[in-house]
Amino acid sequence: MGTTSDEMVPVEQASSTSSLDPLCFECGQQHWARENHLYNYQGEVDDDLVCHICLQPLLQPLDTPCGHTFCHKCLRNFLQEKDFCPLDRKRLHFKLCKKSSILVHKLLDKLLVLCPFSPVCQDVMQRCDLEAHLKNRCPGASHRRVDLERRKTSQTQTQIEGETGSTVIDPPGTLPPETDCSGTVPGERNLTPASLPVWTEEPGLDNPAFEESAAADSVQQPLSLPEGEITTIEIHRSNPYIQLGISIVGGNETPLINIVIQEVYRDGVIARDGRLLAGDQILQVNNYDISNVSHNHARAVLSQPCSTLQLTVLRERRFGSRANSHADGSAPRDEVFQVLLHKRDSTEQLGIKLVRRTDEPGVFILDLLEGGLAAQDGRLNSNDRVLAINGHDLKHGTPELAAQIIQASGERVNLTIARPGKPQPSNGSREAGAHSSSNHAQPPSHSRPGSHKDLTRCVTCQEKHITVKKEPHESLGMTVAGGRGSKSGELPIFVTSVPPHGCLARDGRIKRGDVLLNINGIDLTNLSHSEAVAMLKASAASPAVILKALEVQIAEEAAQATEEQPSAFSENEYDASWSPSWVMWLGLPSALHSCHDIVLRRSYLGSWGFSIVGGYEENHTNQPFFIKTIVLGTPAYYDGRLKCGDMIVAVNGLSTVGMSHSALVPMLKEQRNKVTLTVICWPGSLV
C-alpha cells in the first residue's frame, strides 16, 4: 500500500535546511497521493473487509459487477494496466464498478487504529475519528505544528536579518511547556529541523483536499439550518439510486413518533450537502408527510430513487435561543382565546400534559392524550400556553399548580389560551436539563397529536429449530453479520443474505434477518463475529446441521400494507444492499440486549443536554425511554457516546422499567455533577 523511503522524491531539492518528513493530514503518515492512507490497525480485521490487492483493510471500497470489493485507488491503479478483475480475471471496466453500501463504509469507519504519533500519544480510536484527533487533540501533532511555526518564523526572521542586519530573538512562550529545547517532541528528536508544513500540499504527496473525489467528499463548515423552525431543503444526487448516507430512528410505533437522524456517514450524499446533522427530524419527503407513520414506511419513502430530494426538517433549539428569537419585535402577536371544557363528572381527566419551559415562564401544553376530553374537543394544540384556569392567573405558574386548580374545578374548566400568531413546531420530548421538563422545539402542528402504536404488537419474534442435511464439505450458504463487540455495536449474529443454490436456500427456512442463537448445541449469542464465523464454518463440516434461530417479523397493519410500501424492499434473499431495520432490534427479547454504562459529568448546573420520550404514562402503557435529541454544546454532546434512539434502562443503577415520564425527568435534573446512564444502543436503519 505504501512506498519505501527510497522511492520518495525529495520535496525541496535546493533547501538549505533538511525538513521533517511531510505527512498526510488525514492519516498522519507519509505516502504518495496515488496511494491509500496508512493506518496502524489494532486487533484482527475480518477477511471480508480486506482488499485483495493491497491486503489492507478497504479504503473507499468499490464493488465490481462480479461480486468482489477492492479499494478505490488500488482498483483504479490496477485497471490502468489491466482489463480484468484481479481475483477471477473476468473482463472489467472501472466505470462499471460502484461504491459499496453504507453498511460496509460504516464497518470500515469503526475499525480501531493507533495514533501515528505513538511515542507521545497512545490513543486508540475509530478510523473515522483519526483526522479530527490529529487536528484537535493529539499532543504529538500539536507539538509538530508548534515546532513548524517556530521554525518558519525563525527562517523568515533570518531572511529579514540578512536584508536589514537586525536580530530577532524568539519571543518567550513560543514553545509549550511540554516541548523541550530543541522544539521537537520526544519521538522526533532524531529528526532534522522543519521547513515544510506538517500537512504538506507539495505535488506528489497526499493532500485529500485535492484528490479527484475532493469536490464531492470534502465537508468543511456545515451550512446552518434555523433552529426551532420547519425548513425545506433540496438534496441533489447524480445517481438517483445511491443511498443518502444516514441512519434513522423513530416512527409512530415508538414514543419518538417522528423520524430522527441518528448518524450522518462520511462520504454520503447528506454529508456532502453539509446541512443536516444527527438529531434533525425529517417531517416530509417530497411533500409526503412522514411525521406520524411507521418506521419502515418512512424508510421506504426515503429510499425512493430520485435525483432531487426535497426534505422538510426540524432542528431543535439550543438553550436560550427561543427567548431571543424575536428580539427585533418582528414576532407575530399571540392569539388569546377561551376554551370551556365540560367534564362528565368531577373526576374525569382532561387528557392534557402540562409542562414548564427552561426559557419562558408559565405553563404549556406538551401533548394531548388520544381519546381524552381535550383531544375530542379539538381546539387545543401542543405548544399552547395556558394563561389562566377558571380565572386563576398562571402567567408565572407551574404545572403542579395548574393540576391542582383543574382537580378542584368541578365539571367546568375554563382555559385562557395563548397561541403564537404563526404556527410553531411542537414536540413530545422533555429536556433532561437543570431547570424544567420542557422542549426546545416541537413537532409540526400537522402531526397527529402524540399517538403511537404499541411496539410489542408491531414486532414479533418466533423461535425455530431447523435440521439441514448436506454433503460433508458443502457450505451452508449464508452470510452473517453482528457479534459482540462488532463495529456496528453489540449485536447478535444475524443473517444478511442467503445466496441461491446453496444448502440453506434449498431448504428455505432460514431467511435474511434471522438471528442465529445456536448451531449444533453451541451457543452463538455471546460470541464475537470472528468467533461465530469460525464456529459456523466448523459446524458446516458435519453432514447434518441443527440451527436454532429467531425470526423477527415487523407486522404492518393490513389496511396500510399497500400504502406504506411505495418502494418495497427486494424480497430476494440475496440482496447485497439489504440492511436490518432499527425496529427489528427493538423487538428482540431482553436476553439478547446488551447494556452499557455511560457516565456524564458537568461542572455547572446546566442541562445534561438530551431530551427523552417514553415511560409508563405514554398511552398508559409501559414504553421504554428513548433519547430523542442531543443538544449542541452540552455534556451529552461533548461526550459523544449517546445517540438519538438510545434506550435508557437505568439511571445510577435504578431501573427505569415501569417509571413514569414525569418521575424520570426530575431524577435526571437532581443529579449534580455526575450521572450514570445504562443504555441499549441499536444501530439505526440505513437509507
Curated annotation (Swiss-Prot):
Compositional bias annotation for Polar residues: 154-167, 424-445
Annotated GO MF terms: identical protein binding; PDZ domain binding; zinc ion binding
Domain of life according to the entry: Eukaryota
TM segment ranges: none
Tissue expr: Widely expressed.
Pfam hit, one: PDZ
Subunit structure: Interacts with the phosphotyrosine interaction domain of NUMB.
Comment field on protein domains: The NPXY motif is required for the interaction with the PID domain of NUMB. It is however not sufficient.
Protein name: Ligand of Numb protein X 2
Gene that encodes the chain: Lnx2
